[in-house]
Amino acid sequence: QRKKSATGYSFVMMIMVMLGCSVSAGAVTKNNADTEYQKGNYQQAIRDYEEILNNYGVSAEVYYNLGNAYYRTDNITKAVLNYERAHLLSPGDEDISFNLQFARSKTIDKITPESEMFFVTWWKALVNLTSVDCWAKTGIIAIIMALVLVLVYLFGSHIVLRKIGFFGGIFFVAVFLLSNLFAYQQRQMLINRTGAIIIAPSVNVKKTPAKTSVDLFLLHEGTRVDITDKAMKGWREIKVGDG
């Protein structure tokens, strides 16, 4: 009986291992997609990156690489779309920002963004210095450091150590609070995002939400707009970068 049980157990384990191997063999990895991209097989790389996103969820790096692959196939619209998605997840990444701006310069509509006060630009740059996850990790490290320094302040035997503990603790508490604030603001931007990319070759923007309404202007694929109202079914109120 024991032999039979052992044999049966081994047989089941072998099937499980074989199934695991077949799943692993069938799954596309980022390395596979990167290899296809490096070989110049951009269409295959696109399919692989999109499969990775479908199977494993969103990733700034994968969206960025997908944008690069689309750019290589002269699909500027899809390149802009995926750079925008990557930028949303990792707004502080300089490579993503550069490629996004470069791809935008290739679109038909040349729209200049509205100017804003210098301190608003500075604050946004600070908030977007890194990702939500990185701000969260910074906050955790900061609160741990603050607690350690509080203990140094409370139990330090020398006045110098106690001063370091006191002022260092205040500093890291401030870092903790700011990190959480920045993470919260970025998360709100992710949740309440209003940006959209026009995918159709061209779109007539109407004065009112009616097919018979006057055409105000024409927008082309790849142009970024902000949706300001979507209450009416089938229609969207938008705002373009220049107001």
Label for each model-derived stretch:
Residues 219-243:
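SH3/SH3-like beta-barrel superfamily modules
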Residues 207-221:
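SH3/SH3-like (including bacterial SH3b) beta-barrel domains
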Residues 115-155:
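Membrane-embedded alpha-helical segments of integral membrane proteins
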